[in-house]
């Protein structure tokens, strides 16, 4: 009986460590800077149907800033499609 209890405890510890590792790995990947893109004023970063995605200018602006080439972005609805366009290019020295 003690062996079964010990095995269950080891499985629980392993699963706990695995979950912690996956969470920390996901957080560190989320903080990593994305690949820089060349700056084209008004570039469309993404276009998604509103059935799956609502137009969020805050999310769009964050996505544009994370590319490293823009200072802002706006989300607009065109023909029932949410379109994120990036604006205000950064000067790359």
From Swiss-Prot:
Q: Which GO annotations describe the biological process of this protein?
A: defense response to fungus; killing of cells of another organism
Which residue spans adopt a coiled-coil conformation according to this UniProt entry? none
List localization entries: Secreted
Signal peptide start and end residues: 1-30
- Bridged cysteine pairs (disulfide): 39-89, 55-75, 60-84, 64-86
UniProt keywords, alphabetically = Antimicrobial, Disulfide bond, Fungicide, Plant defense, Secreted, Signal
User: Which GO CC annotations does the UniProt entry carry?
Assistant: extracellular region
Q: Which family does it belong to?
A: Belongs to the DEFL family.
What name is this protein filed under? Answer: Putative defensin-like protein 190
User: Lineage of the source organism?
Assistant: Eukaryota, Viridiplantae, Streptophyta, Embryophyta, Tracheophyta
């Amino acid at each position: 009986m003690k062996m079964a209890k010990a095995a269950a405890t080891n499985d629980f510890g392993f699963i706990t460590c695995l979950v912690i590792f996956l969470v920390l790995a996901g957080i560190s990947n989320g903080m990593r800077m994305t690949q820089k893109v060349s700056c084209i004023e008004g570039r469309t970063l993404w276009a998604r149907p509103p059935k799956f995605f609502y137009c969020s200018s805050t999310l769009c602006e964050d996505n544009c800033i994370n590319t490293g080439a823009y200072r802002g972005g706006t989300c607009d609805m065109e023909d029932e499609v949410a379109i994120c366009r990036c604006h205000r290019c950064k000067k790359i020295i």
